[in-house]
C-alpha cells in the first residue's frame, strides 16, 4: 500500500470515529416508546437503553399481579426492539459502503 493511501485511510478512520461519537451522543437523546396491553403499559427509553419512564394504566393495578408483570416485560422488550431498530437505521447511513459482514452491529 502506498504511503498516501495509508494516510488517506487513517484520515478516513479518524473521521468515522468522530462521526460515530456524534451519532452515539445523538442516540442518547432519541427516545422510543414500547407498549403492551393496547397501550395500558408504556416504557419510554433512549436508544442507549436508558429507561426514562414507565407508565401503568391505573385499571391494571387492581388486576392480576402476574398479568401486570407480563405486560411490563412485554413493554420493555418492545422498547428495546424499537431502540435497536432506530440505532441500526441511524448507523446504517454511516456504514453504507463499508465491507461489513451481514448482521454486524455497530457500535462495537
Swiss-Prot record:
It is found in: Cytoplasm, Nucleoid. Residues 86-108 are annotated as: Disordered. The keyword DNA-binding applies. Residues 86-96 have a biased composition (Polar residues). Keywords: Cytoplasm, DNA-binding. InterPro entries: YbaB-like_sf (IPR036894), YbaB/EbfC (IPR004401). One of its GO terms (molecular function) is DNA binding. GO terms for cellular component: bacterial nucleoid; cytosol. It comes from the Bacteria. Residues 99-108 have a biased composition (Pro residues). Homodimer. Belongs to the YbaB/EbfC family. Binds to DNA and alters its conformation. May be involved in regulation of gene expression, nucleoid organization and DNA protection. This is Nucleoid-associated protein Rmet_2128. It comes from Cupriavidus metallidurans (strain ATCC 43123 / DSM 2839 / NBRC 102507 / CH34) (Ralstonia metallidurans).
Amino acid at each position: 500500500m502506498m504511503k498516501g493511501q495509508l494516510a488517506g485511510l487513517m484520515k478516513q478512520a479518524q473521521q468515522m470515529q468522530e462521526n460515530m461519537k456524534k451519532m452515539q451522543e445523538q442516540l442518547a437523546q432519541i427516545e422510543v416508546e414500547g407498549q403492551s396491553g393496547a397501550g395500558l403499559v408504556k416504557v419510554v427509553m433512549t436508544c442507549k437503553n436508558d429507561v426514562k419512564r414507565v407508565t401503568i394504566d391505573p385499571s391494571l393495578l387492581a388486576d392480576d399481579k402476574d398479568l401486570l408483570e407480563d405486560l411490563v416485560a412485554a413493554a420493555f422488550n418492545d422498547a428495546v426492539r424499537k431502540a435497536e431498530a432506530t440505532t441500526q437505521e441511524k448507523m446504517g447511513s454511516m456504514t453504507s459502503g463499508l465491507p461489513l459482514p451481514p448482521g454486524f452491529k455497530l457500535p462495537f
